Structure formats: C-alpha cells, structure tokens
Amino acid sequence: MKLTRKQATQRRHRRVRRKVFGTSERPRLAVFRSHQHIYAQIIDDTQHRTLAASSTLEPSVKNSELSSTSTCAASAIVGQLIAKKALEKGITQVVFDRGGKIYHGRVRTLAEAAREAGLQF
C-alpha cells in the first residue's frame, strides 16, 4: 500500500528524531511548517526545555509588509528572529531538525536565514 504524504512525513520525522538530539551545549533547532505559518524553536532535549521560539504569528512578523505569512520571505524573517534570540542567550551552535519536511522551500529559507544571522549548523 502506498503511503500518503502525511504518513511519509511522519515516517521521515521519526527517522530524523532518532538521530537528532539537542544538548545544552548544542540545542536542537526544530522547525514546524503548517499550511499558513512556520514555527521555529530552540530546544534542550536533556532538560526538556524550550530556550527560544519564533513564528510567523509574532506581531513583528505579522505587522511587517508581507503579503502572506506562508511565503519564503516570511520564513526568512523567522529565521533571522530565531537566530537573534539564540545569540542573545549565548547559543551559537545548534542541531537542525527539519521536522520530517524535505529541506526545500520555506524550511531551507529559514535555515539559510538563521545561518546568515550567525547560527552555526
């Protein structure tokens, strides 16, 4: 039986999560992409704590002059915001968790924007 797109994403996510683990020295940058928004969190898996979070639901992103929050431009802003918040807390290196999504489009744009803003992964 052929997998649906959702089942394939869930299977990829389980496979990625088996390998990707965030520590306090190098936390995990988890990305979740929905149809209209994109979310990014920096998580310390050893303490089960979210250290920083950013999304297109934040007022600074929503009030910007974007036509939509589901574009690559919006995910680039979220990438810059999450990198800025991480650097303020002294986090320079992270492990990237693409959340089962393919490294393309909005996920890739967020990752590249975070790299340009100073995060290393």
Swiss-Prot record:
UniProt protein name: Large ribosomal subunit protein uL18c
Lineage of the species this protein comes from: Eukaryota, Glaucocystophyceae, Cyanophoraceae, Cyanophora
Pfam families: Ribosomal_L18p
Gene Ontology biological process terms from the UniProt entry: translation
InterPro entries: Ribosomal_uL18_bac-type, Ribosomal_uL18_bac/euk
Entry's family note: Belongs to the universal ribosomal protein uL18 family.
Chain's role: Binds 5S rRNA, forms part of the central protuberance of the 50S subunit.
Top-level taxon in the UniProt lineage: Eukaryota
MF-aspect GO terms: 5S rRNA binding; structural constituent of ribosome
Organism: Cyanophora paradoxa
Record has Ion transport as a keyword: no
Keywords assigned by UniProt, alphabetized: Cyanelle, Plastid, Ribonucleoprotein, Ribosomal protein, RNA-binding, rRNA-binding
NCBIfam families reported in the protein's UniProt record: L18_bact
Quaternary structure and partners: Part of the 50S ribosomal subunit; contacts the 5S rRNA.
